[in-house]
Swiss-Prot record:
Keywords: Cytoplasm, DNA-binding, Transcription, Transcription regulation. The keyword Transcription applies. Belongs to the TACO1 family. GO terms for cellular component: cytosol. NCBIfam families: PRK00110.1, PRK12378.1, YebC/PmpR family DNA-binding transcriptional regulator. Pfam families: TACO1_YebC_N, Transcrip_reg. This is Probable transcriptional regulatory protein CCA_00169. It is found in: Cytoplasm. It comes from Chlamydia caviae (strain ATCC VR-813 / DSM 19441 / 03DC25 / GPIC). PANTHER family: TRANSCRIPTIONAL REGULATORY PROTEIN YEBC-RELATED, TRANSLATIONAL ACTIVATOR OF CYTOCHROME C OXIDASE 1. One of its GO terms (molecular function) is DNA binding.
């Protein structure tokens, strides 16, 4: 979400994009291991695992990495991964949502407390920040693969809700979460390649803050994004 902020300069956006690629790979590997824990290591009988393996291949994760983690997931010592969400208030009334996938919730909670101790802000009760955001389905499409006008016409055709142009590298087609699979399928049928699809949080309103608070919020967000278990950080800073 940093691309939406006037405080996020080009250098920050590039560094974040590079870091995010690594996070995507890490998240997919964790999803793969969770799928094995839930339904076994055979993709022929585990539909969820079959989908995640295809996702990993689409992201160009090497086959040897996939195979190695499939074996690791069957180990009795390997704990299962869980999705967890944290809500924070940063500086100047800015709300922050953190999504993580972890095999140790105590470790992740400790990392979150360290983040606010080092960079400020406050962890708050569930629901305290979420009401400022809407859950949306999102299909990511490389800006190098299609022009905006063409994609916009497709967005209307497939019944999506909006086209977000604020990301540095991708157009983001937004839709109702329950329609995500259908929207992606229709886009693919029209020849559009979706590099990633997932559920995201979109701010319902943006919060203006001064330069001091803006820089403090970015420092907090950067720290949160560096936590190993964290996959996504959303905020509503203008």
């Amino acid at each position: 979400m940093a691309g939406h902020s006037k405080w996020a300069n080009t250098k920050y956006r590039k560094e974040r994009a590079d870091h995010k690629r690594g996070k995507i790979f890490s998240r997919t590997i964790k999803e793969l291991m969770a799928a094995v824990k839930m339904g076994g290591p055979d993709p022929k009988t585990n539909a969820r695992l079959r989908v995640v393996i295809q996702k990993a291949k689409d992201q160009n994760i090497p086959n040897e990495n996939i195979e190695r983690n499939l074996k690791k997931a069957t180990s009795a010592d390997q704990k299962n991964f869980e999705d967890v969400t944290y809500e924070l208030y940063g500086f100047g009334g800015v709300g922050i949502i953190v999504e993580a996938m972890t095999d140790n919730k105590n470790r992740t909670a400790s990392d979150m407390r360290i983040a606010v101790n080092k960079r400020g802000g406050s962890l708050v009760e569930p629901g305290s920040v979420l009401y400022n955001f809407a859950r949306k389905g999102a299909c990511y499409i490389s800006k190098s693969s299609i022009d905006e006008a063409t994609l916009l016409s497709h967005v209307i055709d497939v019944g999506a809700e909006d086209l977000d142009n604020d990301d540095e590298e991708n157009f983001i087609v937004l839709c109702d979460p329950v329609e995500l699979a259908s929207v992606k399928e229709k886009l693919v049928a029209l020849g559009v390649t979706c590099s990633e699809e997932k559920l995201i949080y979109v701010p319902l309103r943006l919060v203006d803050c001064d330069e001091k608070d803006g820089e403090a919020n970015l420092a907090l967000i950067e720290w949160l994004e560096q936590i190993d278990d964290v996959d996504e950080v959303y905020h509503n800073m203008a």
